[in-house]
């Protein structure tokens, strides 16, 4: 499907952590895509599609992320792309976006909510299961492993952990 944004559209992106290599790569890709889009559409000056990319420096700083989402919504963006640290904590912001007819695209974390228009994410459960297979192979299909999750409230982290532990329990019980 063709993407034909209106001149002057604002794509607001709020991520979990602006300091991580993953999100730096996402920002680089999104910046290049918006540049290409502006060239393709012939947008110049104020007609260019604008991309803002914000978030806390620390992936555990839920309050800072909520404040960032509030500030972004005050700018009335055309669309909000969000990778929430804790989806339950930003319900009011999602309701505000819906009330202002700002579509919400969730990045990197699955979420089940009528307040979200679409989700763009890895199948984190499958990624966790694949990590378990590789780990089991590396240790001869038996032994003990420890799980060190990076973010307890992150749906992506929870799904990866669940995929990993269920794969280990099912296929590598020793």
Residue map of PLM features:
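A residue-level marker of the well-folded mature domains of exported/periplasmic proteins
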Residues: 1-174
